[in-house]
Amino acid sequence: MLNNQDFIHTLNPQQQKAVLHTKGPLLLLAGAGTGKTKVLTSRIANIVHQNLASPQNILAVTFTNKAAKEMAERVNSLINCYGLNIGTFHSMAARILRDQIEHLNLGLNNRFTIISHDDQLKLVKDIVKLKDIDTKKYAPKLIHIIISRWKDQGLLPSKLSASDTNLPLQRVAKLVYEEYQKNLLISNVLDFGDLLLYNNELFIKNPEILRYYQEKYRYILIDEYQDTNVVQYLWARMLASLYKNICCVGDDDQSIYGWRGAEVGNILRFEKDFAGATIIKLEQNYRSTLPILAAASNVINNNKNRHGKTLWTDRESGEKIKIISCWSDKEEARYIAGEIDKLVREDRYNAGNIAILVRAGFQTRSFEEAFINSAMPYKIIGGLRFYERMEIRDVLAYIRISLNQNDNLALERIINVPKRAIGAASLNKIRVYALERNISNFAAIKEMLEMGEIKAKPYETLKDLVTKIDNWHERFSIDAPINVVKAILDDSGYLEMLQEEKTEEAFGRIENINEMLRAIAEFNDIHDFIEHSSLVMENEVLETNYGGSVTIMTLHAAKGLEFDVVFLPGWEEGVFPSQRSLDEEGEKGLEEERRIAYVGITRAKKDLYITHAESRKIFYEIVRSYPSRFITEIPDEITIRTSSMKKYNSFYKF
């Protein structure tokens, strides 16, 4: 355990300045690889060490559970600091709502559950169908995106202005949004957007509750501030408005999530929001070589809307940036696969320390083929995460309906899994009955069974299901969660259904369920597990053992990671910068594309390759390509520019 002077002396001068600033608003502009996590954790340790606040009065907010866990571990390695409030925006908001939900007078209780993205979309689809909305004109997925964006902006249906509903699609979305919120409240469930949205409503309508949390959280630290949306920004600003001891850490040059609601303006206007704010820049980079940093700085300097900063390093040496022209995207993939094979065979780098970062998903196919042909192990980062897999979501739905019998979405997911001969007509009859009486579908089934409204085979299967759900509900209050979930798997017939399939896929699903049971066994309270799984689904970053495999992933997914060698393919106009971004967002879109380029360049520690093709196959058509403008922004003196075609030139001399 270090004492105060020990951990302060491990910091560079700018880092020390940030750690020792303990009063008033602070914006910490932390460039890529400049040690921001070290500064954040040292700052928390210093606040506690100086007795400026107890750990319970410090709130640190991150965007992922992984980042929150890492921050807590690193703080505790510096100083005994138990009781800190470290978590994601959603987890902290959920905690506050569980304590204060009754003050919103929405009919919710503190046992509300948090529904997943898929369940949100299903509810939207159900409402669209019920309202007889033309899905060809008004796609449910698009309606759901609009509703989510409104929530990110802090807008409930009642707060939507005329300008928010100018277009026919927006007017339809508002109609669905109103019904969507009613359904959530009836079911005693919330979606992720509601957590902060209702937090802010709680604070606005109950000043005394806001004051309580302002007193509780006297020091606030927010990581990745450039990625915050409007509702997150408003939440943080309200909490910090009393003591103003807020430290926001971020890099406007790495704001690349505008497409999902992030507002780079939040970090750019920090000084206006918090009068007298101090701004400290972390510019000494500990990750990359000088040529890599020079390339990144020269590219990003072309953006106008940014806080000026220049990364530097005391490491003078470094490989020049390789910029390679290839005649096609297939040749580009073959060249990169061959170069990686050479780097690995010559023992210059391990395959696990090499990454290919693409701008768009369609670029990956040619690399898969090239690596298969060269027998190079590779890993494409993507696919379904654990808690998004079908069988896991099914079991979660069984648990949710057992805990909260008003959860319509959970009931509808499992009512015919395994098959119970409950047809669409019976389901619709239940929905209509419930809506007319403003009750949940489960309550409707119970009443309809008692009144003889359900006949023939559905009567027996529904009666059996209701009896079992009631039994599981009771058992959860007296038995260990793991025992009840095992009973659910057996009694429902779900496990038997998978076992009878006798396919590799079914066996894989059973293995996943067993893994889920191992996770449940770690929780004494099933509600804690449900909340944990919901928050993990929203924030989880795919964990991959890079081992000896080359990593292929998108530039967006690579943010926060680093590799010895990085290949950046497809640097062509229309591909990168994306033509769609330019067409839809103009100059704003171009600046975000340039920030994505900056993120890609700064992932490299030692070696960086940028490639572009003379022609590219896009949607089955071969298109002539031109080098990206971002390539022209990199100075010639730090690059080696070659063509993968030079080795073939001798064959065409006459």
UniProtKB/Swiss-Prot annotation:
One of its GO terms (cellular component) is cytosol. Residues 290-560 form the UvrD-like helicase C-terminal domain. Has both ATPase and helicase activities. Unwinds DNA duplexes with 3' to 5' polarity with respect to the bound strand and initiates unwinding most effectively when a single-stranded region is present. Involved in the post-incision events of nucleotide excision repair and methyl-directed mismatch repair. Residues 9-289 form the UvrD-like helicase ATP-binding domain. It catalyses: Couples ATP hydrolysis with the unwinding of duplex DNA by translocating in the 3'-5' direction; ATP + H2O = ADP + phosphate + H(+). Keywords: ATP-binding, DNA damage, DNA repair, DNA replication, DNA-binding, Helicase, Hydrolase, Isomerase, Nucleotide-binding. Its EC number is 5.6.2.4. It comes from the Bacteria. Transmembrane segments: none annotated. This is Probable DNA helicase II homolog. GO terms for molecular function: 3'-5' DNA helicase activity; ATP binding; ATP hydrolysis activity; DNA binding. It comes from Rickettsia felis (strain ATCC VR-1525 / URRWXCal2) (Rickettsia azadi).
